[in-house]
Amino acid sequence: MKMMDANEIISFIQNSKKSTPVKVYIKGDLEGIDFGSSAKTFITGNVGVVFGEWQDIQAAIEANQDKIEDYVVENDRRNSAIPLLDLKGIKARIEPGAIIRDHVEIGDNAVIMMGAVINIGAVVGEGTMIDMNAVLGGRATVGKNCHIGAGAVLAGVIEPPSAKPVVIEDDVLVGANAVILEGVTVGKGAVVAAGAVVVEDVPPYTVVAGVPARVIKQIDEQTRAKTEIKQELRQL
């Protein structure tokens, strides 16, 4: 798995062309109206839909007010620096409502549930599940066959660029609403209890709980049974 350097991300954001994409439903005498070079138009007769940058489409609307009867604008961002990840070629299960930004790496057979938010530079390993409303901040790295519970937060580190990102090693279970602070590494096979706040590294094959989180025991057979990762949920 590849970890994106913080300065690469900062440079990407700085130099990216900021975008305010819109979808406009429009009605009027639309023939011959130029909505800008980047616009895509789907017009039949006197009605249509236009996709493009608001700056260009707004200028066209204002220049042709006498021809346009009505319009409605759909808009969900302003001067956005980072597009969303193109999901069509990802070999993973990604449910509606997940927000995944560009330059995120998602391993095969991963599962991203509704409402999860994954920021630029994050890595999700093969067979890992990111549950509902979990947040992976910038550059957070999760290994293979993990489960990041609902509402859990893995802190992001893009600024300052020298900060060490969160690293979750393979076969880790992070409980619901747990928080892993920047710079923390959670060792292979560990379990982080629900609601824990993890401020220091977690040794492999241990269970941590509490605020701040402390090791409460080593992984035993009972814990393994309660935290089993089901591959059936990861099949495509």
Curated annotation (Swiss-Prot):
Record's keyword terms, sorted: Acyltransferase, Amino-acid biosynthesis, Diaminopimelate biosynthesis, Lysine biosynthesis, Repeat, Transferase
Top-level EC class: transferase
Transmembrane helix as UniProt keyword: no
GO molecular function: tetrahydrodipicolinate N-acetyltransferase activity
Family matches, as NCBIfam families: DapD_Ac
PANTHER family: 2,3,4,5-TETRAHYDROPYRIDINE-2,6-DICARBOXYLATE N-ACETYLTRANSFERASE (PTHR43300:SF10), ACETYLTRANSFERASE (PTHR43300)
Official protein name in the record: 2,3,4,5-tetrahydropyridine-2,6-dicarboxylate N-acetyltransferase
Protein source organism: Geobacillus kaustophilus (strain HTA426)
Gene behind this protein: dapH
